[in-house]
A protein has these predicted regions:
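Short, solvent-exposed polar/charged micro-motifs at secondary-structure junctions
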Residues: 40-42, 77, 109-110, 146-150
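A generic signature of intrinsically disordered, low-complexity regions enriched in glycine/proline
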Residues: 69, 85, 109-112, 152
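Short, glycine/charge-rich beta-strand/loop segments that flank catalytic centers
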Residues: 71, 99-108, 129, 139-142
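Glycine-rich, Trp-frequent "lid" loop and neighboring beta-strands that shape
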Residues: 75, 115-155
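N-terminal glycine-rich flavin-associated loop
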Residues: 99-119, 148
């Protein structure tokens, strides 16, 4: 099946590949070291400085929040055009956070962008889009043993 990616998607594929080579792959060992230090200190749940440093560069280079089909912070992108970008980002365990394209934040930002009122967007969406906070997704329901939201039975 042949898909034709937009010029923008093709350009971003090149830019992301370069960013991975220049910034992310070299940062993976530093990330592992910083995480090991946190673990040894008994406080693993910190954000390593290397992640924050690379997030700043990604944002400056316009490689930020690319997943949003209707991006309030910039240009929009179709799922078809985003797919090869996600594939590239998936080559590193730290890339999605650096590009602010990590689950569950991506899905939660899409929901907030589409359905939240202005106050909710100000409180939750904007800090998520800026990479200042993280989000979570949780569901529970009697007689449904799964973390797959499509299995929800209540209406």
């Amino acid at each position: 099946m042949g898909f034709q990616f937009s010029d923008r998607s093709q350009e971003l594929q090149l830019r992301i590949t370069k960013f991975l080579d220049d910034h992310i792959y070299p940062a993976e060992e530093i990330y592992a070291q910083q995480m090991q230090e946190f673990t040894e200190q008994g406080d693993r749940w910190q954000i390593p400085q290397i992640i924050e440093d690379k997030k700043k560069i990604a944002k400056e280079e316009g490689l930020w929040n690319l997943f949003l089909p209707e991006n309030p912070m910039g240009e929009s992108m179709s799922n078809l055009d985003y797919a090869p970008l996600a594939e590239l980002m998936g080559r590193s365990g730290i890339a999605s956070e650096i590009f602010n394209c990590s689950a569950p934040d991506t899905g939660n930002m899409e929901v907030l962008a589409r359905y939240a009122n202005e106050e909710q967007q100000e409180r939750w969406l904007k800090p998520l889009l800026e990479g200042e906070i993280r989000s979570a997704f949780a569901m529970t329901e009697p007689a449904v043993a799964s973390s797959d939201a499509t299995n929800i039975c209540s209406s």
